[in-house]
C-alpha cells in the first residue's frame, strides 16, 4: 500500500494547485460516475447531467459530520486527490474526478419573474411526481429571512440532529446566507443558489429539507421607487430591500433596454447638421445686418466702434511684438534643430566661407555707393543670418565626399579691413595691379582633399553631388576648381601643366576657338585651277583630347578618330572637286555676260566655236533637267513656315541659278527673247578683280528658281 501510495505521488508530480485556494464543504465534491451509482435502471431524464452533479447525500452527511467532529480529512488534500486526472482509480482520463470549488459565473440568469418559483410551491404528493423538476430552480434568501425562520427550521427538522447542527452552523455565516448551502450546492455572486440532488438521495431526507424551504415571500403591495443597487459586498446586508424591488426593476429594465436612436441618426443625409450650420450662418448674418443698421441710424455708436477697432489693433500690435520678442529669444539647440538650424554652424561660418558670396556684391556697390562701409556691413549681416536649406547626409555619404570645399589661403587671411581698403581704393582712383590681384585672390577658391575644417558641416550639408570622390556644389557660391599644389607653382609652369593635364570637368572654350580659327581661316576664293590644288580650307576640326584613366576607352576613341579622319578626307576630296567645277562654270558664264550677248557668228566674238558649242550644250542640258524637276516640284508642299516664306521671296527673283540664262532657237533668228529678268550678283571672289566685282545676268522670269548648287559664300 505504501509503495502504491508513493508511486501515485511520483506519478502526480505536476500537481494541480488550482483548488488549494478554496475551502469549505464543496472542496471534496466530485462528479459521480455510473459505477458509483445504484444498479437500478434509470430513464434518460434521470441520467441527465443536471441531476447527476452532486454526490449522494448520505456521503455528504458523513463527510460533514466528520468535519465537525474534527476527524475529517483535510479538505485541500482531499480535493487534490479527487481532482487529479492521473489517479489510479480513474481509468478514463477525460472523465475522472473533478474539483468543483466554485461553479458560479456571470452567465446565470438574473432575477426575473420565473426565478421566484420556490421549492415550497410543491406538496409532498407532487414532489414524488416531479422529483427533479425543482433541482435547478434558484431561490434568493436573505439573512433576515433565515434569522426569522430559524425556529421553524429547528422544529421541522428535529428528526435528524446532525442535519440540524449543520444547517444552523451554515446559516450562522454572515455573507453566504442560503439554506441550499447546507446541501452543498454552489453559491453564485448574487446569492442565487442551485440545489442539485442526485437520483440516489433518499426521498425522506429530501422531503425534510424541502419542508424547511416553505417560506413566505414578502408581498409586493406597491411599486417601489427606483433605488441605487449597491456593490456585491454590501448586497447581502441590503438583500431584503433589493428582493422586494427587484421584480419592478426587471420590468422597468426590460422596457428601458430597447434600442434608442438619436434624432441625428433618424435624420437622413446629415440634414440635421446642415440645418444647424445654416441656422448659425443666418444668425451671424442677421447680427451683422443689425449692427450695420444701428451704425447708420445712430452716430454715437460709430465712435464706439472706431474706438473698439483701434483697441483691437493695438492689442494685435502688442501680440505681434510679443511674438517677435519670443522669436528673438535664445532657444535651445534641440528647438533650433527642428527649425533647420544646425548647432554651432552659423558661428563657425567665418569670412572664409562667406567671401565668395560677399565679394561680387562689392563690385556692384562700388560705382554708385555713397556709404559703402554701411552697405557692406549690412550685406555681411544678411549673409550671416541667411538661412540655408540643410541637406541631411548619412555618415557614409560624408565619408564618400573625399574632397571638401575650403577657400583660398589668401582669401582666408583677408578680413573686413582688406575688403574696406579695396573699396576705399576704388573711390580714390583707378585700381592698382596689386589691389586687383588681391581682389581676384579673395574671389578664388580651391578644393583641398581630405582636409579638416571648422565649417565642414556647413559645406557638406550644402546641396551638392559627388562624382569620382569629388564634391560638385549645386549652390550659387562660385568656387574655382583648382588643385591645392597649383598655387605654389609659377604662371609658366601652370600653363605647361594645363596643356598637359586638361581637367575632365572644365571645357576651356578659348583653346577650342584658337584651334578652330587657326585651321578654318578660309582664304578669299581664287580661280578654279588654284582651288582644285588647294586643300587647306577644307581641313576637318580636330577633337580635343580627353585624359581618361581607362585604357580601353582611349583605344576605342583612337579607332573612332582614325575612321572619322578617313571619312572626312574622302568627303573633302569629292566636295572640292565638285564645287570647284561648278564655280569654274559660273565664272566662265559671268565673264561671257560681261563681254556681251552670245552670238553664233565667230567673227563677233574673240572666243572660238568650241567654247560656244560647249556653252550651248550645257544650257540645253540644264533646260532638260529643269523641266524634269518642274514636274516633281508641282506636287511638293512646304511644311515649315520659314522655308515657305523664303521660297516665296526667291520664287520671284532668284530661283534656279543652275540655269543662268536660257537659249531659244527661233525660226527667224537665234537670239534671246525680250522677256528677260536682269539681276546683279555680288560675289566675294569678284572683289579682287575690281571692275568685274558685279555682273548682270539676264534670265527668263518663268524659269528662275532656287537651286542647291550655289557656290559657297555667294550672296544673291
From Swiss-Prot:
Subcellular location: Bud neck
Primary subcellular site in the record, as a coarse category: other
GO annotation (BP), single: secondary cell septum biogenesis
Domain of life, per lineage: Eukaryota
Residue ranges with Polar residues bias: 370-382
GO CC aspect terms: cellular bud neck septin collar; cellular bud neck split septin rings; nuclear inner membrane; plasma membrane
Residue ranges, compositional bias (Basic and acidic residues): 1-16
Region described as Disordered: 1-30, 370-394
Family statement: Belongs to the AIM44 family.
Name by which UniProt lists this protein: Altered inheritance of mitochondria protein 44
